[in-house]
């Protein structure tokens, strides 16, 4: 017997379905469900008197014979490829199916088998995304990792050795000994991690030993001397080993101007950090590299989005991070040359146009690693308010804009760093690195963080309480973040040369080393999903005004932001 119910009642019971719309937290961003892969009248739901019971929604199939380890029911997936309602199956730590879960003995159209060995995570009324990827980490302190994880970031790539002055300023781990010690420490953390070695050298030898010692990327940083010779050498070695190069260019233009740096690229693929320039780079026009096919441009989050406070906070932040002395006029001039309201305003618009492809933090070194996701959506909201709907969107929803912005911290950094076959999206065959959100808290405070199929973090009430929800509620590590469960549910990204050797045995680590691949000639700006625009960019050397294809890019600073104080009262 079938029964008709209203959309609102259905959404309350099973979550939104095709054509329903959802507001993302307190932003002006509205998403609309494009497709529902579940079957009306055959939805599965866990609980007393609900569907997932023996002989009903739960079959007799063993895990060995195909039942999933975990099913996330009725979740609204938000990813670069779509905004879709579905059940999601996880088996052996991998996403194995996206579709309709249930018992094939009594239900039609079942793609995902629920058996006695299947656990359930209720996704009704929740949004499911891929875990975030922050590709600009200064490994200054290990406590960063927990803060990033609790914000929804499950992969971190960067450099450093702890609170050394080299690490305060640069995302580089110098030399194979330091790289080895850092990789050994990674067994303690329930996230995917990768090390960038120091790329500043004019001869190949030092770079080769870092790559073979475990680095999955090389970083060129101006504080170590990003000269044309160092750039050319670093890219040449990276081509030989198929690893990515990230660059922080020469703010002072001592060894050349932006044109000289571009010439040293020789058309080779490179990931340009904080492409706007406040985080560092040729002043005032490093932003022009975002127009190049071979440059994969990213932002760091202190300039995201442009607000009335952005300029004021940057000067002191820069002086500390780059070991500068405010009593020295030249140091002060160096700092002031990097902070330009005109290029920061243009950065907002270039993100909205899809010309800036990725978002990252620059953790504790002019960046807040717990705010990569928040600031991405604050930027999207600011642009919706100031620029209106994108041409690809309708008056009903902002689906394309949401896909563009979520790609900036999920699939695009995964592509840029050669790991998109394993992570970066909610797709079958990929590691189950997933984040579940209540729509009212989307982008700010996750409901549940899943890493390699195990719940590793969640908000949790008083452990002595009779139920799990009484206050005080804090984000806490869960069982997946402890013991051997941690090391089998996360990996260390490294070079193919290191993974093929005896590095894991020599270092005595428990985590699996996973090689990066296809990050040189196989990718370009065109590979950046929804973020591959290459407008011709010009910067006025006197006024710092930025033009894209002749059009002035400017916008007012935000006075108020969503996803801000109302979410952090307690």
Curated annotation (Swiss-Prot):
EC number(s) from the headed UniProt entry: 3.5.1.5
Pfam family for this entry, one: Amidohydro_1
Binding site residues for Ni(2+) 1: 136, 138, 219, 362
Pathway entry: Nitrogen metabolism; urea degradation; CO(2) and NH(3) from urea (urease route): step 1/1
HAMAP family referenced in this protein's UniProt entry, alphabetically: Urease_alpha
Complex and partners: Heterotrimer of UreA (gamma), UreB (beta) and UreC (alpha) subunits. Three heterotrimers associate to form the active enzyme.
Name of the featured protein: Urease subunit alpha
Organism of this sequence: Rhodopseudomonas palustris (strain TIE-1)
GN (gene name): ureC
